[in-house]
Amino acid sequence: MKGSDVKVAPVIAIVICFAFVSLGDIVSLKTKAKFPSLAVAIVAYLIAIWCGMPKTYPDVSGLAALGDILFPVFVAGLATSILPISIVKNWKFIIIGCIAVLAGFLCTVVVGGLFYDPREMFAAAMTTCGSGLTGGLIVLDRLKGTGLTEMVTIPLLLACTIDAIGQPVGSLITRKYAGKLIASDAYLTDKIVDHSDGGKLNKWGAPFNSSENPSPRFCAWIPPKYETEAVAFLQLIVVTALAMWLGGITGLGWSIVLILLGFGGTFIGLFRMNMLDRTQTGGFVMAAIYALLFQMLNDMTLQEIMAKIVPLLLVILLSGVGLVLGG
């Protein structure tokens, strides 16, 4: 009987999947995130299956299926992680970020398209310039939905490893702009404004423009005593379902609609900040998403990865150059 065909108990499968996730977390903490958790977990999983470990663990555990379902909920949680007032105060950051992303995207598609399939470069650029793992999984979902499964290799590899590359670039751009802010005393000015706005309270006693009432104008809809973990999770699931429906009838796709609904819901008082954290399920949701990636990687061989090394490095190089120049 082949190792990949071995039947395993769901509980054992869950233990194995969580072991890889935990290993990634431990190594990331030990190395101060020099080796990101996801990259470590992915490398460990690939080595294990190439050495004969059964590939059935993500499926038998049920985590991969949950990851597929919960990933949009994770995106909904991300959409509630920014204070509306921060968007206004940090408009320079946003403009610089948009220019950098556009430059990186165009550099990857235009220059990379001269050497490889432009469609493949487009999908890769959406991953490197579209918020890493989150953008990569959205791209993979769209590729599979349109039947372009032959183009998933590079976006999948990038989704698993891009944080290890993107974090230093993001840090460079942030330090570059932060230096200008400090030099112009803009940072201190923002701090003074923050303190002067802190006295206005909503009817529940929480300050406006705070994590408990992110909206600058509207009171939180749900009284704090009723926003339990289950209620917070229900809010995320409802807005996710609404985004799926609206994305289908408008053609915009669920991800764009979900981000807009998340931002809008935060502004009008429907959501508080960091809704996924309030459900106390963030760790489990991420473990399920990791298992989903494990499942996607099951059929990937070392030879296939080596064959994509050159275009993979080209995408990372072009995206990095574009992001730095644009920022």
Feature roles, as predicted:
Residues K2-A65, L78-T80, K203-E304:
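Structural signature of multi-pass alpha-helical membrane transport proteins
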Residues G52-P54, T108-G113, I138-L143, L148, ...:
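Hydrophobic alpha-helical transmembrane segments in multi-pass integral membrane proteins
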Residues V8-A9, K55-V60, K89-F93, E120-F122, ...:
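Short alpha-helical transmembrane interface motifs in multi-pass membrane proteins
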Residues T153-Q167, S171-W221, K225:
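Long hydrophobic alpha-helical segments that form multi-pass transmembrane helix bundles
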Residues A65-F71, L78-V110, L156, V231-Q235, ...:
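Entry/N-cap segments of selected transmembrane alpha helices
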Residues K32-K34, T80-I87, F115-M121, D141-V152, ...:
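Juxtamembrane helix-boundary/capping and inter-helix hinge elements in multi-pass membrane proteins
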Residues L29, A33, P54, V109, ...:
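Transmembrane helix-loop junctions in multipass membrane proteins, especially transporters and channels
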Residues F115-V152, L156-L157, T161, V169, ...:
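Alpha-helical membrane segments and immediately flanking helix-loop junctions
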